[in-house]
Amino acid sequence: MIPTRKTDEKFYRLFSTFHAFSEHLTKREDNELRDKYDHNAFCYSGQPTEDELRAALAYQKERGDTFLKLEGYEPLANAFGMECEETLTMVLPPETDIRSWKTNPDVSIKAPDADQLEQHELKYYGPLYGDDFTVRNNRNLREKLTYLGAYLGGKLVGDCYIFASDGYVCMDGLLVDEDFRHQYIAMTLMKHIAEKAQERGEILYLHADSEDTPKELYAKMGFQAVDKLYEYLCTDFSKLKI
């Protein structure tokens, strides 16, 4: 198994229970956040049959869930009409020289104030996912993960969270205030985390959308793509082709 997959699974087990559902499907369930797609996905080990997908759909309907998500490490030959998104796992090799990463000396890194963190995330995620979900999600994550905040002039201008296991450190949820873009906020956060990881002999990694620009920036910083997750989501069951 690719080592980061083991760390990712341990991450999900912080929030979700896992149970075998069918020959090719394992179900994740987070009863604290029933409406969070990633925490309640079906993980496939091979191509699900139409009968398996029908059973998965019936299960979701019985739970009152209005979505169906499948994810796995190989593309599906039959996606049943669902759109696919690809997420890269990018690892920073431990020998990477990070001294050239540009940072902002006026930025301080510390644990963010809980209220400031909620307001910071509401500003961006509220319009996308709704205020109620954004607050519930942040509080759920904050209970079990380590958040880091970037402060400039006493203001929280960036944040992310980290999860460490088995010699690997995953950095995710990076969010920078758009009013402070191009001031090396993200780079300062990332360098802080990378330095700590290297000091402890741990390997830093992150996830990046295969279609978005940040993956190219990460590559220039020295991150290398080592894995790819295929994610299939349906929020309108009438569009499923089964």
Regions found by a protein language model. Give the residues of each.
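Acyl-donor-binding surface of acyltransferase catalytic domains
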Residues: 45-107, 232-234
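Conserved GNAT acetyl-CoA-binding A-motif
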Residues: 62-71, 197-209
